[in-house]
A protein has these predicted regions:
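Formylglycine-dependent
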Residues: 1-36, 43-52, 225-227
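Short glycine/proline-rich turn/loop motifs
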Residues: 2-10, 54-59, 144-149
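The substrate-binding groove and active-site-proximal loops of carbohydrate-active enzymes
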Residues: 7-19, 58-71
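A structural signal for well-ordered alpha-helical segments within the folded catalytic domains
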Residues: 19-23, 70-77, 159-166, 182-185
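Active-site His/acidic residue clusters
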Residues: 25-67, 103-105, 109-112
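Loop/turn elements at helix/coil->beta-strand transitions in domains of secreted/extracellular proteins
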Residues: 32-39, 88-94, 137-139, 196-200, ...
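Metal-dependent active-site segment of extracytoplasmic phospho-/sulfohydrolases and closely related
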Residues: 72-109
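C-terminal cap/loop subdomain of S1 sulfatases and analogous C-terminal strand-loop tails that border
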Residues: 102-134, 148-153, 157-234
Length: 234
C-alpha cells in the first residue's frame, strides 16, 4: 500500500515500522517536554499489510491481526510510560481513536477471518469499514487527561471527529480564521466529560459514496443500487 519515494535509500522493513515511529514519538516528547506540544501518532497497526515485529509474532491467537494489536498496545504503552517518566502524564490530553469501523478480511491472505473465533470487532452493529451502516461509521474514541477528565466516564453523546478541530481550538484559546472548518463545532465539554451535549446531526459517507444522516436516535441511509466498490466490503 502506498509507495516509497527516494529509491533504494528510502526502503523500509514493515516489521520495523512500529519501532521506528514509536522511537520518533518518544524523541519528540523528550525534545518538547518543557513547552506545550501537539503530537499526532499515526500508527500502521492494525491496518493491512499486517507485519508485526518478530517479538510480537504468536502473542495472540488471532494470528497476524491479533499480533498487530498487541504491537499497537505496546506502542501506546511506551508513550504513556515516557509521559509518566517525564512527569507530563497528569497534564497531557490523550485522544485515541480510529478513522473507520473494523475490517477483518481486507483482501490479504493472513487468516484474519479464519482465526477470529467468536470475537466480533463491530460488536452488535451491522456492517464494517467501507459501509454506511453503523459498524462502518461509528468508531471508538477514548480521551484521557488525569488533571481535567474524571476517569471511568462513558458518554453516548453524538459527536464527530470533525468537531475536534473547533473543540481543541477552544481548549487552546485559538481564534479560528473566518470560514475555517465551517462543519466543525465546539463540543469541548463533551470531549472532557463536563457535559453530554449532542451534535444535532452528522453527515457520513461510505466508500461507494453512499451518504447518510445520523441523529441521536435515528439514521437515514440513501438508497443505492450501484455495485460494491470492493468485493470484500459489506
Amino acid at each position: 500500500i502506498g509507495y516509497m519515494k527516494g529509491g533504494g535509500k528510502a526502503l523500509w522493513k514493515d516489521e520495523n515500522l512500529a519501532d521506528s515511529i514509536t522511537t520518533h514519538a518518544l524523541d519528540f516528547i523528550k525534545a518538547n517536554k518543557d513547552k506545550p506540544f501537539f503530537m499526532y501518532f499515526a500508527t500502521n497497526d492494525v491496518h493491512v499489510p499486517r507485519f508485526p515485529h518478530d517479538r510480537f509474532r504468536g502473542k495472540n491467537p488471532m494470528g497476524l491481526r491479533g499480533d498487530a494489536i498487541v504491537q499497537f498496545d505496546w506502542s501506546v504503552g511506551q508513550i504513556l510510560d515516557e509521559l509518566d517518566r517525564l512527569g507530563l502524564r497528569e497534564n497531557t490530553l490523550i485522544i485515541l481513536s480510529s478513522d473507520n469501523g473494523p475490517v477483518v478480511d481486507d483482501g490479504y491472505a493472513d487468516q484474519a477471518e479464519e482465526l477470529l473465533g467468536d470475537h466480533k470487532p463491530g460488536g452488535p452493529l451491522r456492517g464494517g469499514k467501507y459501509s454506511a451502516f453503523e459498524a462502518g461509521t461509528r468508531i471508538p474514541a477514548i480521551a484521557s487527561w488525569p488533571k481535567e477528565i474524571k476517569k471511568g466516564q462513558v458518554s453516548d453523546a453524538l459527536m464527530s471527529q470533525v468537531d475536534w478541530f473547533a473543540s481543541l481550538a477552544a481548549l487552546t484559546g485559538s481564534v479560528l480564521p473566518k470560514g475555517a472548518a465551517p462543519d466543525s463545532y465546539n463540543y469541548l465539554g463533551t470531549l472532557l466529560g463536563t457535559d453530554n451535549a449532542d451534535r444535532p446531526w452528522v453527515i457520513e459517507q461510505a466508500s461507494d459514496h453512499t451518504l447518510s444522516v445520523r441523529t441521536k436516535d435515528w439514521k437515514y441511509i440513501e438508497t443505492s443500487n450501484g455495485p460494491k466498490m470492493v468485493p470484500w466490503g459489506p
